[in-house]
Amino acid sequence: MAITNKLIITLLLLISIAVVHCLSFRVEIDEFEPPQQGEQEGPRRRPGGGSGEGWEEESTNHPYHFRKRSFSDWFQSKEGFVRVLPKFTKHAPALFRGIENYRFSLVEMEPTTFFVPHHLDADAVFIVLQGKGVIEFVTDKTKESFHITKGDVVRIPSGVTNFITNTNQTVPLRLAQITVPVNNPGNYKDYFPAASQFQQSYFNGFTKEVLSTSFNVPEELLGRLVTRSKEIGQGIIRRISPDQIKELAEHATSPSNKHKAKKEKEEDKDLRTLWTPFNLFAIDPIYSNDFGHFHEAHPKNYNQLQDLHIAAAWANMTQGSLFLPHFNSKTTFVTFVENGCARFEMATPYKFQRGQQQWPGQGQEEEEDMSENVHKVVSRVCKGEVFIVPAGHPFTILSQDQDFIAVGFGIYATNSKRTFLAGEENLLSNLNPAATRVTFGVGSKVAEKLFTSQNYSYFAPTSRSQQQIPEKHKPSFQSILDFAGF
């Protein structure tokens, strides 16, 4: 009899716990405000799990995505290339007016090549995507060279002559660069002391008499120096010998090495601080877990970036991961996909129709959009492509079927704040309970379930089956049996 009673009690307890456990995952209907009459149901998703298979596939034509064909070849030869995106305002004048003065480019140098000395009428920051090399900076008072490698961030100050050597014998040197012109918004020029196949020397802007007097040499010698490279058909990226590489790299130092103590003017110290490289991977990732890592150099922490208000970032995502939805308060990110493909989603107040060739403000009189609609921007972004994330726009990235690597330049990064909308640490879970009820029309328990169920911060698995449930949330049936006397 006693055993029968224990069994009955045990079964009742098990049934009660199971019912409570199931109810805890239900949406409590009475805590929702009743829908307004005429309210329509949202778009349905295709059936399927969260692992990437079955996700709703959609491709929209919008100005935030720049495919490989968007690049123009500024220079190309068998030794390497320089490819530049058009001005962002040429693509969408109204949308990208805030970043009109910024240009994005890619540089690739084949093994054992040399990018000839030149300077820009612009400031530039590049990230080394692949390979190793040496960069040397030269002024009329000082010169300094550095070894550079994958993950290095290098500032090239406006007007400072520099040249780059790919010291590797097998691997190309690849750079992603953001450039900030100082003369004409969105337009900059390279200035070369020596002529090449497609570039004139800036000495061509002076008369022979002036040059001969300035250098104190005969005009015949001057002519050979200025025009020789052009006559033999060499480009701005040239093949060099192992001995030349050894000579060019002989005095290069690692960015981590301290400068030798010597007397120098304060302005020279400032310049040397600006052009000293640093490595993103030497910085602890600001976001990191099993599903992704995010390294970021902020202008408040690096003198090289401070006056440009630019951040440099490197993101690594594993297959089947999600960079949780978030937005940047002031920063617009220009993002380059270094490897893999991913699904990019973003909320925007601007509407774009499939096949639309004109964006708001392009070729038409600008009119303020007072629409309250939010539109979904969706793209599959792949290796070699660029996408833009404007300030204030909530977005997310899903690496569904492969690992994903991207680098980014954050424009107007000073005093910008990144706010996550989902994850263990998120904006919505911090709302006052009363504000939550008024805003979303749900009770506190439902809000807590909605905004605190994610067990990961920053990066999360796309499959719900991979979501780890903390031990404290798991039902302990053994404790029930213990209570019943088994």
Curated annotation (Swiss-Prot):
Residues 1-22 form the signal peptide. SUPFAM superfamilies: RmlC-like cupins (SSF51182). Residues 34-60 are annotated as: Disordered. Keywords: Glycoprotein, Signal. Residues 64-223, 278-448 form the Cupin type-1 domain. Predominantly expressed in the embryo and endosperm of developing seeds. Also present in seedlings. Glycans are attached at residues 168, 316, 455. Induction: (Microbial infection) Accumulates after 0.5 to 6 hours of tobacco mosaic virus (TMV) infection. SMART domains: Cupin_1 (SM00835). Disulfide bonds: none annotated. CDD domains: cupin_7S_vicilin-like_C, cupin_7S_vicilin-like_N. GO terms for biological process: response to virus. Disruption phenotype: (Microbial infection) Reduced tobacco mosaic virus (TMV) accumulation associated with altered endoplasmic reticulum (ER) transition in TMV-infected cells. Seed storage protein. (Microbial infection) Involved in tobacco mosaic virus (TMV) replication. Required for endoplasmic reticulum (ER) aggregations mediated by TMV main replicase (P126) upon viral infection. Belongs to the 7S seed storage protein family. This is Vicilin-like seed storage protein At3g22640. The gene is PAP85.
